[in-house]
UniProtKB/Swiss-Prot annotation:
Upper lineage: Bacteria, Bacillati, Bacillota, Clostridia, Eubacteriales
Annotated residues for binding of Zn(2+): C14, C17, C36, C39
Described function: ATP-dependent specificity component of the Clp protease. It directs the protease to specific substrates. Can perform chaperone functions in the absence of ClpP.
GO biological process, one term: proteolysis involved in protein catabolic process
SUBUNIT field: Component of the ClpX-ClpP complex. Forms a hexameric ring that, in the presence of ATP, binds to fourteen ClpP subunits assembled into a disk-like structure with a central cavity, resembling the structure of eukaryotic proteasomes.
InterPro entries documented for this protein: AAA+_ATPase (IPR003593), ATP-dep_Clp_protease_ClpX (IPR050052), ATPase_AAA_core (IPR003959), Clp_ATPase_C (IPR019489), Clp_protease_ATP-bd_su_ClpX (IPR004487), ClpX_bact (IPR046425), P-loop_NTPase (IPR027417), Znf_CppX_C4 (IPR010603)
Gene that this polypeptide is encoded by: clpX
MF (Gene Ontology): ATP binding; ATP hydrolysis activity; ATP-dependent protein folding chaperone; protein dimerization activity; unfolded protein binding; zinc ion binding
Highest taxon in the source lineage: Bacteria
Descriptive protein name: ATP-dependent Clp protease ATP-binding subunit ClpX
Source organism (scientific name): Heliobacterium modesticaldum (strain ATCC 51547 / Ice1)
SUPFAM superfamilies xrefs: Glucocorticoid receptor-like (DNA-binding domain), P-loop containing nucleoside triphosphate hydrolases
Residues in ClpX-type ZB domain copies: 2-55
Keyword Metal-binding carried by entry: yes
Length: 420
């Protein structure tokens, strides 16, 4: 309570509601104005309501499929068919949320997504970018760390906890988020026939995931870990959460080729020609039956109706990934050097050598940064301590570790820094 603004306390009153000082708990003074605690509380409520309205997800805010695709193009190189399929699936998912799952007595079912593609082809990046475009909470989980309840490992509810944490514990916001479950192929059944022994990290996890994929009110332990009776739970409805499952599914192309071969043999088709297709082209012919043969259970496949396939990235695509996206690695390194007033350049041969090394290591786009870190470590260690370097050129020989980067020096820069 503020005093000293006048001898007559009754003259002090709230400039907003007009209540006198002795009618309220607190009266805060500003230059020539006063506000009481009740008006402050009311203002906070109004601001909170407006913020909630801003955060409310509205169909008008959801970009159209073409717009989603255009934004994906800024971050993800290649994978044109995958970007198209994901744009449509995501748009339809959030349209379903906003219009209600039942329209004119027709129930609109949830369309979770399964992505198949080699390591480093962009599965995780696509899922992350979609969440960024839609401004919804996003969580990544690794299927290999999951086990069914009662066994050592993570419960499937821990996936939902990551989403709640990404939403700053705003449950309503989390219920419209996106969850990406990586390495989903690693929880495939070990054999096509059901086993007598318990498969706690394979079929058991698939069974545990069924409910949250379809839509249920899950009890999520707020501190993570295993459930125990005396713990309070967060209730999270998964009906409107979009689940994207991704995996490399190594060897599934053979199952597809076997199916295609059997199907076309009676028509004297050129089976050999089909078998010579690239793996990426073969994957595009995938059907749910191939996922079943790989080891996913029918109920699990049924809850992932949208199948998206990605191609292995070739040398040209990897070079484009290095230079074209908004957050391209070359642009990032150039910015690091720019902060030390050094211009960084990569020759075309150097970029191709980096791409070739990533292909050799079979790491796809994911391995590009590791290669660059290895090559650039020494020069990034030395340059900040030198005040005469103005330019650094990286050639093919540098990538092949045959030469050091070419450094251009200038006495003018050295003198300028010394005088500063």
């Amino acid at each position: 309570m503020y005093k000293g603004f006048g001898d007559d306390k009754s003259q002090l009153k709230c400039s907003f509601c007009g209540k006198l000082q002795d009618q309220v708990k607190k009266l805060v003074a500003g230059p020539g104005v006063y506000i009481c605690d009740e008006c402050i509380e009311l203002c906070n409520e109004i601001i909170e309501e407006e913020l909630q309205d801003e955060n409310t997800f509205d169909l008008g805010d959801v970009p159209k499929p073409k717009e989603i695709r255009e934004i994906l193009d800024q971050y993800v190189i290649g994978q044109e068919q995958a970007k198209k399929a994901l744009s449509v699936a995501v748009y339809n998912h959030y349209k379903r949320i906003n219009l209600g799952s039942k329209i004119d007595d027709i129930e609109l079912q949830k369309s979770n997504i399964i992505m198949l593609g080699p390591t480093g082809s962009g599965k995780t990046l696509l899922a992350q970018t979609l969440a960024r475009i839609l401004n919804v909470p996003f969580a990544i989980a690794d299927a290999t760390s999951l086990t069914e309840a009662g066994y050592v490992g993570e419960d499937v509810e821990n996936i939902l906890l990551k989403l709640i944490q990404a939403a700053d514990y705003d449950v309503e916001k989390a219920e419209k988020g996106i969850v990406y479950i990586d390495e989903i192929d690693k929880i495939a059944r070990k054999s096509e026939n059901p086993s007598i022994t318990r498969d706690v990290s394979g079929e058991g996890v698939q069974q545990a995931l069924l409910k949250i994929l379809e839509g249920t009110v899950a009890s999520v332990p707020p501190q993570g870990g295993r459930k125990h009776p005396h713990q309070e739970f967060i209730q999270l409805d998964t009906t409107n959460i979009l689940f994207i499952c991704g995996g490399a599914f190594d060897g599934i192309e053979k199952l597809i080729m076997n199916r295609i071969g059997k199907k076309t043999m009676g028509f004297n088709a050129d089976i050999k020609g089909k078998q010579e297709k690239k793996i990426g082209e073969t994957l595009r012919e995938i059907l749910p039956v191939d996922l079943l043969k790989f080891g996913l259970i029918p109920e699990f496949v049924g809850r992932l109706p949208v199948i998206v396939t990605l191609d292995a990235l070739d040398e040209d695509a990897l070079v484009r990934i290095l230079t074209e996206p908004k957050n391209a690695l070359v642009k990032q390194y150039q910015k690091f050097f720019e902060l030390d007033q050094v211009q960084l350049e990569f020759t075309d041969d150097a970029l191709r050598a980096i791409a070739q090394e990533a292909i050799k290591r079979n790491t796809g786009a994911r391995g590009l940064r590791a290669i660059l870190e290895e090559v650039m470590l020494d020069v990034m260690y030395d340059i900040p301590s030198r005040n005469d370097v103005t330019k650094c050129a990286v050639t093919k020989e540098v990538i092949l570790k045959q030469k050091e980067p070419v450094l251009v020096t200038s006495d003018r820069k050295k003198k300028k820094e010394e005088s500063a």
